């Protein structure tokens, strides 16, 4: 799946930046600035079939990506990162105190009826719950688990995008 199309000024390509600079081990694919939202986006083409694998491998990996990306963004905001890289430009001048942090996990081909259970699993996961308390305390269900159909409807991926 490919996200977009978006204007470059609205997208922090977190994964590309972290791979280039080796600053964090994992990161979400991108942070999209849309209105008063900072949308942290991650996409997966599949998920493990067993709930044990989901809980022991999948959820920890996704949670680590969000955590590392939040640290990366915060360190840039606090001017700890002294990087001069155009990939950081979309972070500059953002009024973070006015932005709502949202986390979307897009699961390709996931049937709509399976999304609520996954949504609940993500939002109950301890690390994600802890991050929510710090970064988005007034928001319930801050991790949104959606499929590619919903992502397309929301304008997060292009029509016909596979």
Residue ranges and their predicted role:
Residues 9-10, 19-20, 80-85, 115:
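A short linear-motif detector with a strong N-terminal bias
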Residues 23-35, 90-99:
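Short, surface-exposed loop and linker segments with low hydrophobicity and enrichment for Pro/Ser/Thr
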């Amino acid at each position: 799946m490919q996200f977009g199309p978006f204007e470059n000024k609205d997208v922090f390509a977190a994964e590309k930046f972290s791979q280039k600079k080796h600053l964090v081990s994992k990161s979400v694919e991108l942070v999209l600035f849309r209105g008063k939202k900072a949308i942290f986006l991650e996409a997966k083409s599949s998920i493990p079939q067993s709930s044990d694998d989901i809980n022991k491998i999948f959820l920890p990996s996704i949670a680590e990506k969000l955590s590392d990306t939040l640290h990366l963004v915060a360190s840039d905001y606090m001017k700890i990162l002294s990087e001069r890289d155009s990939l950081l430009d979309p972070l500059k001048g953002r009024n973070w105190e006015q932005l709502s942090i949202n986390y979307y996990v897009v699961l390709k081909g996931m049937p709509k009826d399976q999304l609520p259970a996954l949504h609940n699993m993500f939002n109950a996961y301890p690390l994600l719950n802890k991050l929510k308390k710090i970064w988005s305390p007034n928001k319930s269900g801050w991790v949104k688990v959606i499929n590619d159909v919903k992502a397309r409807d929301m304008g997060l991926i292009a029509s016909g995008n596979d």
